[in-house]
């Protein structure tokens, strides 16, 4: 086992324990503060990742030039700032707090473990089977890894029912399996979304905060796309 993999596993376990503690014991106000801090870190990493784009944005903007807002690059690069600010500092915190406190802790943990297992499945299948690349956006992603993600995403609901965990009413049925597969799909698309911007800016990672992983965005890229989408699903009563 490589030292890099050991660091990756160790960091993941520490991060998981901290996350579980905060989810279970933080009250809503402190939880909101914590999620806001997470959002700020993600926003900063987003800006750092898009450094080349942001430099171009600066060049395209001149507050004293009347035609600054007619420059097509201004709108293109401003959208990078705007998306990051709105998504990480508004949409994400609202979604997380709603799912944790207005839906339930158990459901939030269910989502979290679907994403974790999906990520693990992608790594296990991709590393051991390999095969044809999934897309040029992320050369390390393989089709076998994607299949592994889908397969592993069903494990949480199977484990819940095998252990007959009390107070968790998530049955092993077609709808819940389909939901787990959908969450895995969104996780993978979220990963590819951020990989696209990293590749666009010749970046391997979004940061150096987490040993073995890179930045915080590298670790939770799928989850932070999943949560707002599930928030909308719950708001509209789809699931």
Regions found by a protein language model. Give the residues of each.
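Membrane-embedded alpha-helical bundles of polytopic integral membrane proteins
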Residues: 1-181, 185
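Short glycine/threonine-rich catalytic loop with a Thr-x-Gly-x-Asp
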Residues: 144, 188, 216-220
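Interfacial loop-to-transmembrane junctions
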Residues: 199-222
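Juxtamembrane boundary at the C-terminal end of a transmembrane helix
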Residues: 232-239
